[in-house]
């Protein structure tokens, strides 16, 4: 977990304090898997604090492509329950489906006029990155060779295979982050078009419905931040609806 002193870690303790005051029946927390290994034990301390005030706490790492989100996105889920211990894996099994591909999510957006709205307007790559994109398509490859990368991404910890990569049509995408506009932030080059993803495409890969409004985002940066940092709506639905199903079956009392 790289952001060990991230101020957002404090949100864990805010959740525990809120649970102590309001006593909800359930508390759900989502984060990256590395949060469990934070050297300050923020995640585990929060779990213990919830236990101390009477909650049964379970947590699991899940991959969102198991519930139909078209990306490889691992997340650490914690559910604290005033009732019985919630089996998170059982909830995931209730909604498990075949992985959805990039093609399934965004292929119909290729026909849109890319200049109509901020949502469908691709970013303009640098001259060097445009050459790298062209290289991927000219050679019909999905991973940019090391020698084609800038020197800072050829050595040490910067040699991630997905950086400067092209998405596969027939697979889930890599994890969508706020860096989806830039190929130097991950495998964000479109499978069929010589550009990186648009905000509309990234939102689809995050499982946002097309009717969802991002009108509050006035800039490309704010739009990317909202989309990339979001909890995919499908995950929220699965966890909440799954808990309700367990309640109706009498497994959470």
Regions found by a protein language model. Name each.
Residues 124-253:
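C-terminal target-recognition/interaction regions appended to catalytic cores
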Residues 1-163:
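Class I S-adenosyl-L-methionine
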